Amino acid sequence: MVFMKVLCLIDGLGSGGAQRQLVGLASLLKKEGYDVLVVYYHGDHFFVPFLKEKGVAYRYVGGANRVDEKFIKVFKTIKSFGPDAVISYMGGANMLACLIRLAGRRFHLIVSERSLTQRLDLKTRLKFFLYRFSDYVVPNSHAESDFIARNIPALRKKLVTITNFVDLDRFYPDYTLFREEKILRLLCVASVRRVKNTLGLISAVKRVIDEGYAIRVDWFGDSLEDDYYQDCLQSVEKFHLQDVFYFHASMADIAGEYRKVDLFCMPSLYEGFPNVLCEAMACGLPVIASNVSDNAYIMGKDNEEFLFDPCSVEDMAACIIRFQKLSLEKRLQIGRTNRESALQKFSRENFVSQYIRLIK
């Protein structure tokens, strides 16, 4: 049996969620017998060791700053590899893939939307116009699919929602680590920037402490907006939270951190389809999150009381306190339910099979 050639295109292989999904997809396709090549053009190589470990071929076509230079380099790479299908992730790579197809290269094209569109500016309209030359447009969230269907009717028939997968063998629970302590251990995994609402959580934690509850917060993620990060540090100092709220750099092996804490929190103002929320649930961890994008779908009806308004410090603090009042038995029950939900929604097998159906 002759398997197809699949080229996976993305701007860079930095430490983000979209990059993790792309290299994961590439490794799963290779495992299914496809001839896979990952191509990227920005100098972010975080996931290269993963590709090497999985035996997935990759090619860095860097050194191009202008769009025309990137186009030529990626065009030549696609021509050389001769893929039957191209799967692109992220807006810039999606647009490049559409332009290369317009330039005469013949391949099945699947473009994947990895974020939640906030406004239809000129660049976004151009991107969606180019998507008309793809075979499928694959948002990773139902919220983004709804937005595109509502605002870009020409793309409705191309839309197929494929939500993210989680490595359920890597992200697993250890219920023996759950214990009833006075101090609630809360975890956040996100870059430090405005959209992630770090300042909002800091203010909510201050309110929780003022209500007489003990809490420790560990935030794992790099600072992508230095001014905002400095504002966060100043707020921590102003509220005397230096022994409560801790910042840590992002780390490749975050799975163990999920198993050390009592509760995961995602306070973002908006999201695409958040990998870390799915990972936390896969680890059997209770979660609270802002009621935006697909968070309600991810968490399910059993967790409706743990959704909050990210613009309301009071609502966020009340949600934390509501969880803090629960017994250890109830917390364990929530964690087990979350694990079962993750097994049903976020399996690798379901994820890759949906892409294979589109490739064929």
Q: What is the role of each PLM region?
A:
Residues K301-V313, R322-L328:
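Conserved acidic donor-binding segment of nucleotide-sugar-dependent glycosyltransferases
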Residues P286-A289:
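Short hydrophobic beta-strand element within catalytic cores of glycosyltransferases
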Residues R66, D146-R150, T163-K182:
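Acidic anion/phosphate-binding donor-loop and adjacent secondary structure
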Residues S88-M95, E113:
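Short His-centered aromatic/hydrophobic patch
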Residues S250, L269:
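Aromatic "clamp/platform" in nucleotide-sugar-dependent glycosyltransferases that forms part
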Residues Q230-A249:
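Nucleotide-activated donor-binding/catalytic signature segment of Leloir-type glycosyltransferases, i.e.
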Residues V38-H45, V189, R216-Q230:
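Glycosyltransferase donor-sugar binding loop
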Residues G16-S27, S191-D210, V217, D227-Q230, ...:
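A conserved mid-protein helix/loop that constitutes part of the nucleotide-sugar donor-binding site
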